[in-house]
Structures are given as C-alpha cells and as structure tokens.
Amino acid sequence: MPLPIVAIIGRPNVGKSTLANRLAGDQHAIVHDEPGITRDRTYRPGFWQDRDFQIVDTGGLVFDDDTEFLPLIREQSLAALNEASAAIFVVDGQTGPTTGDLEIADWLRQQPVPVLLAVNKCESPELGLIQATQFWELGLGNPYPISGIHGNGTGELLDDLITYLPPPEEITQSDEIKVAIIGRPNVGKSSLLNALLGENRAIVSPISGTTRDAIDTVIQHNEQTYRLIDTAGIRRKKNVEYGAEFFSINRAFKAIRRCDVVLFVIDAIDGVTDQDLKLADRIIEEGRSVVLVINKWDAVDKDSYTIYEYKTNIFSRLYFMEWAPIIFVSAMTGQRVNKILELVNSSTEEHRRRVTTAVINEVLQEAVTWHSPPTTRQGKQGKIYYGTQVSTQPPTIALFVNDPKRFNENYRRYIESQFRKQLGFPGTPIRLLWRGKKVREVEQSANRATKV
C-alpha cells in the first residue's frame, strides 16, 4: 500500500507550512509573511520514530468569503481529507479561537477522519498550556500546544498522530521517474498536469501565476510510477518582486535540478520567447532530459504544413535542443496528451543509457578519419587517445587527449554531432569532458580502453 497521508488544515497564516516544514525536516513549503501563500495542496515525506508518511499541506481555509481562490482552496482541502488517514488542525495560540476556527472545527467534525488539534505559536511551554486551554471549546479533544518554528510540543503531537496511521507494511519502491512541468507563466502547465492526472488536482485559473509551490503528484501508468512536479511559472527577473513569487521561481529551478525529465511547455501562440531561451539554457545547464510540449495547439489555424513549419521555427530558436522530442498538444481538449508519457519513457531511457568503451572509440575513430583534429599555428596537432563513458543522467563521456586547448569549439561540436549521429541519445543532453593525458599514462591505460 502507499504511504499513509496526514493532512494539515487551518485558516490562513496560522503557520501550517511552518509546521509542515518541521514535520518534514526541510524548508520545502514557501513560508512568508503574506497570508495565504499555500494555494494548492503540496506533498512531501515525513517520518516519526519508525513510521513513514506523506504530509499534505493545504491552502488557508475560509468559509465566509467566495473571492477567486477560496472556493478552490476549500475543494483542495476536502480532497486532502478524503485521501488522508489523519488530519492536524492548526490554530493560532496567540490570537485565541476565532470565528474562522469554529467554522472549520464544525466542518471537520463532519469528516470521517481523526483530527488532532495543534495550537501553534506557543513559544513558551508554560504559557502555551494556558493558550491551549482556550481551544477546548472547538470540541475536537485535547489541544496540543506546539511551536512550529522551534519544535516545542511536536514530539507529543506526533506520538499520538502515528497511533491513527495504518500499521506499517512492506512498501515496494518502484523505479520512479520524476517529471518537472516547466514553463513561463500561463502557458498551461497546471492544465497539462490536470490532463495527465485526469482530475482537478492543481488549481487552474486564467490569472497568471496561480501555482506558487512545486507540487508533487505520484501517478502510475502501465506499471511505471511517475512523480509529476507542477511548478510556478518562471518570469523575467525584473518582473519578479521579492516575496513569495521569488521563492517559487527558486523552487522551480530546484525542481529542474531534482527531476529526471523536464516537460518544457511552450505556448503555441507565442512561440519561443527570449524567456523560453533562458529557461532552455537552465535545463541544459542542469543536464536534464527534455520533452518539448507545444501547448494550446487547438488555438492554431492549421493545414498539412503547419507542424513542419512550427518545428522549423522552434528549432531555429532552440537549435541547441534539436535532439529533444517535440509534441503538439492541447491540455484543454486532451489532444495527444496521452502520448506524452511515451516520450518521457524514451527520454528517461536515453538519459540513463550506457555505451561500451569499444563502441565509443569506434565512433571516435570514424570521426577522426573523416575530420582530423585541428593544428595550432605552431604546427602542433590535437590527438584523441580514447574515450569512455564515466556517468549517466546525463550521459557523460570523457575524452582523453594530448592537450584540450588544441581542440576549438567547432571541433568539439563536430565530435558531439558524431556521437549524436551514430548513437542517437534523443531526448537527453550529452556532456563531453576533454581531459589532457600524457603518452605514458595512455600506454598504461591501454589495457582498459581502446586507443583511437
């Protein structure tokens, strides 16, 4: 069975994300002074003693306001409770019980999930006991005085929490593929996530920038497990104010770093923008495999040549990503969305691929035969002794040469193009490491690598 889920519920600005960070032992959720920072429900692992579980951090609940996001946040909170084994209701010990707390408590009593009442911001253990007693009136049992920032009282809360979780069972760890959905604001990342999930999991709104956390969702398809990461849209730095959006963009960059494959979402109407080029550079820099997802294809007037023309225009801008598979989709209508995971699988396979040293040196030998290494003005010619793959994700090949400085950028690009031509590696960048090596060292290495 999957890990049990613990939902964290409460009104805005009571410290839900701070407590979630404490339980998860990290700073994953955005914590900022602006109320209502967490809009979607976000998942990450937590543990206590010998028990593992998933923490679900939800948006701030308000029942007396129907503006824009609040009905959507209520839906997200209910969805979190429906999949949870237990819930932690967080209240603010410094303000005392509020009307909002009473409304949430009434609502929670109607849910079939055990609820623990955590009275947050009780920084003093002695004063915290007094602050906590005010919350008996909520009718949810024993209030636990805690400090999400300092950790006071969280041990007792967790001791009781794990008694409500299902008994430990063997959990088979699948070979999970982590997929980050990356793109500028409002290109349809959350709509794409929803289309992949088949449910309304991430908040979708026409307002640019409505996904502010990196949100992990685990799905299975054809016995393969995928972790889908929907991120905040990435804007130009000059358009980003210091605050929650700044941290979200940081989170998106971290999502690129920790994923296996990037679904790089591009707006079919706008085409490849300058900001897309900067994003592409970042993806290459992190060595991630890529699937180019051209979204909003339903909004484009098409004839039999349209896809060819679009591909030509896209790769004229993203010429350094010509190896990336490309798919034209509509997240709104579902057009071709079911083909995306096939491309994710093939790109992941190439990203993890290993090539034998013998094959690498066959490619090098043919490449050098067709185009000799350059010669310096002093008449000294570059020489490639041999190559070998030293790592994967991305595939990285070390080339041992007499002097790396003798190989200009044009020749380095030529060698990379020969590896692409002979070995393929579609969907993933490859890295070439040019390493200087003396003749004597090469001779000593001859027993484990074929010289070119």
UniProtKB/Swiss-Prot annotation:
CDD domains: EngA1, EngA2. The keyword GTP-binding applies. GO terms for molecular function: ATP hydrolysis activity; GTP binding; ribosome binding. PROSITE patterns: G_ENGA (PS51712). The keyword Methyltransferase does not apply. One of its GO terms (biological process) is ribosome biogenesis. Residues 353-438 form the KH-like domain. Belongs to the TRAFAC class TrmE-Era-EngA-EngB-Septin-like GTPase superfamily. EngA (Der) GTPase family. This is GTPase Der. It comes from Rippkaea orientalis (strain PCC 8801 / RF-1) (Cyanothece sp. (strain PCC 8801)). The lineage of its organism: Bacteria, Bacillati, Cyanobacteriota, Cyanophyceae, Oscillatoriophycideae.
